[in-house]
Amino acid sequence: MKRIEEKEKAIMDEIMEMHALAEKAVELSFRAMRGDKSVVREISRIEQQTDVLDTDINYACTTFIALFQPVARDLRFAISIMRISSSYERIADIAQEISLYESKLPEIVFKAEKYLKKMFDAVKEGYTKTEGLKERMTELDNAVDEIYVEAIEQLEESCDVNAVLTVRHIERIGDLLAKIAARQIFIKEGRRVWII
């Protein structure tokens, strides 16, 4: 294995750790929304881990660019991975914020959990295979968006700011996962796509 491939593998190992941490934070945030506030401390710990990992990944990618002066796919990899890492870190931040809110949420909000889980699964698969990823993520992101719209309509008269923020944050997690998928396609195929 060439040094450049070894470095890419090391960076990818950290990205997969970020993926797992962000997914766990989101899973725990749904438990917190259901009233289990015992998970708040664990989400906070995960959020701190993602902060450190994001810094490590950005440093590793910057070093990768400086040492190897990559072109084409390798350059797309380094630049895109930094942005992907930041998206995972932001997802963990959002999950932490959600866990701190106290509010009564419409039941439809909890349907978003299964779609976000499917989005995480699709993104994980996207590191090895991007065929059909755009279409799959578009469909899942649209499902989360529809839940957001319906939940906001149900919350219109309640004036529950925490509930509105929670719903908005859930929709934002879907958007961030869609952006990660778009960057995966850019790395593999060299083309820019928008998943909206």
Curated annotation (Swiss-Prot):
Pfam families in alphabetical order: PhoU
The protein, known as: Phosphate-specific transport system accessory protein PhoU homolog
A single GO BP: phosphate ion transport
One CC-aspect GO term: cytoplasm
UniProt family annotation: Belongs to the PhoU family.
Localization of this protein: Cytoplasm
NCBIfam families with a match to the protein in the record: phoU_full
Self-association state and partner proteins as the record states: Homodimer.
Protein source organism: Archaeoglobus fulgidus (strain ATCC 49558 / DSM 4304 / JCM 9628 / NBRC 100126 / VC-16)
Record's keyword annotation contains Cytoplasm: yes
